[in-house]
């Protein structure tokens, strides 16, 4: 006995039934309502063929009768058919209402799935946009520096030398008669000059008081102002 090929999916089983019973099943287009109890007829007619089991036949029938094209065919005035396409009675109103409800629920599920997919795409696009914006912010180009002319020497600013404080110009006292008591002047001591105040003008010189409080008589050539 030769081995028969095995059908692995419900779609393959439906394609086999449409080829075997073209007056009952169809692989595309609007489907005709099936006779009530057609499952038992299938078991009797194709039992053992193509290694089909009852489970496979039941699953294929469930997929076929829940498809949109089959539910569209379950409408007022439609006639049920058997495996050979013979009429087997008109559809009842309750069966038509049930098919209409199944079709509406199936459409609602598809719309909900599409809406969820659209929302995920929008979220992914928004997240990608934020990430790109963050990368652009991180990689913000630095302002372009003006190009130096070719051959131009790079000049470094010269350090500015600190100006030495100007030496205070002092006038030597040549005539003590020009001095007055309380007048501020300086007493020369080597290269330094100390602040002092005139206390008294004597014949021996000028008595002055230093800022330290010490008083002394100084000759005119040691006084400046």
UniProtKB/Swiss-Prot annotation:
One Pfam family here: ProQ
GO MF annotations, alphabetized: RNA strand annealing activity; RNA strand-exchange activity
Chain intervals with Basic residues compositional bias: 137-146
Subcellular location field: Cytoplasm
Naturally occurring in which organism (per UniProt): Klebsiella pneumoniae subsp. pneumoniae (strain ATCC 700721 / MGH 78578)
Keywords: Chaperone, Cytoplasm, RNA-binding
Family of the protein in this entry: Belongs to the ProQ family.
Protein name per its UniProtKB record: RNA chaperone ProQ
GO biological process assignments: post-transcriptional regulation of gene expression
InterPro entries per the UniProt record, alphabetical: ProQ, ProQ/FinO, ProQ/FinO_sf, ProQ_C
Main localisation: cytoplasm
Gene designation per UniProt: proQ
Biased composition regions of type Low complexity, renumbered to the chain: 109-118
Ranges where the record places region Disordered: 107-169
Residue spans of biased composition, Basic and acidic residues class: 147-156
GO cellular component, one term: cytosol
């Amino acid at each position: 006995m030769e081995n028969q090929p095995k059908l692995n999916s419900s779609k393959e089983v439906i394609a086999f039934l449409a080829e075997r019973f073209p007056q009952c099943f169809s692989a595309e287009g609007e489907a005709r309502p099936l006779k009530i109890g057609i499952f038992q007829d299938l078991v009797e007619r194709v039992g053992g063929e193509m290694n089909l089991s009852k489970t496979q036949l039941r699953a294929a029938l469930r997929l076929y009768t829940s498809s949109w094209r089959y539910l569209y065919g379950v409408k007022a005035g439609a006639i049920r058919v058997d495996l050979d396409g013979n009429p087997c009675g008109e559809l009842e109103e309750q069966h038509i209402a049930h098919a209409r409800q199944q079709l509406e629920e199936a459409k609602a599920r598809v719309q909900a799935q599409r809406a969820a997919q659209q929302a995920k795409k929008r979220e992914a696009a928004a997240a990608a946009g934020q990430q790109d914006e963050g990368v652009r912010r991180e990689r913000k180009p630095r302002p372009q520096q003006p190009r130096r002319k070719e051959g131009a020497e790079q000049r470094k600013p010269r350090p500015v030398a600190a100006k030495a404080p100007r030496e205070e110009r002092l006038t030597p006292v040549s005539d003590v008669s020009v001095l007055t008591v309380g007048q501020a002047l300086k007493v020369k001591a080597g290269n330094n000059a100390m602040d002092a105040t005139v206390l008294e003008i004597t014949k021996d010189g000028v008595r002055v008081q230093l800022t330290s409080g010490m008083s002394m008589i100084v000759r005119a050539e040691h006084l400046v102002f």
